[in-house]
Amino acid sequence: MQKRVRNRLITIIICFCSAALGISIVLYNLEKNIVFFLPPSKINEIEQGKELRVGGLVKIDSINKIAADKISFVITDNIRDLEILYQGVLPALFREGQGIIAIGQLSDGKFIARQLLAKHDENYRPPS
């Protein structure tokens, strides 16, 4: 009986360790794909040059077209403002007062975005 209990215990431990390892691998790989972001009030100068995702509302009267495909605007979380520079095609839902997530790097107090994601509420209807 002793040998049977020991074998069962070893089998349970191996199954538990295998499941824990599998879950760890899945969570590690998902970390890069989960879109989380920091509000402007949580950004500090220490994170210069690091790839970040920042999110907030586009401030009213802050959109400034520099060139045909280059734009600057300010996002806010009602605590702190952050200027964003972006070159590329704007998302269809981009407008003042709209929530956005910008992916890029902080440089000299300005955020240089390489990608913009427009957020929408649960009542989204595609533009017609």
Curated annotation (Swiss-Prot):
Heme binds at residues 120, 124. GO terms for molecular function: heme binding; metal ion binding. InterPro entries: CcmE, CcmE-like_sf, NA-bd_OB-fold. Keywords: Cell inner membrane, Cell membrane, Cytochrome c-type biogenesis, Heme, Iron, Membrane, Metal-binding, Signal-anchor, Transmembrane, Transmembrane helix. GO terms for biological process: cytochrome complex assembly. SUPFAM superfamilies: Heme chaperone CcmE (SSF82093). It is a single-pass type II membrane protein. It is found in: Cell inner membrane. Residues 30-128 are periplasmic. Residues 1-8 are cytoplasmic. The chain crosses the membrane at residues 9-29. GO terms for cellular component: plasma membrane. Belongs to the CcmE/CycJ family. Heme chaperone required for the biogenesis of c-type cytochromes. Transiently binds heme delivered by CcmC and transfers the heme to apo-cytochromes in a process facilitated by CcmF and CcmH. This is Cytochrome c-type biogenesis protein CcmE. It comes from Rickettsia felis (strain ATCC VR-1525 / URRWXCal2) (Rickettsia azadi).
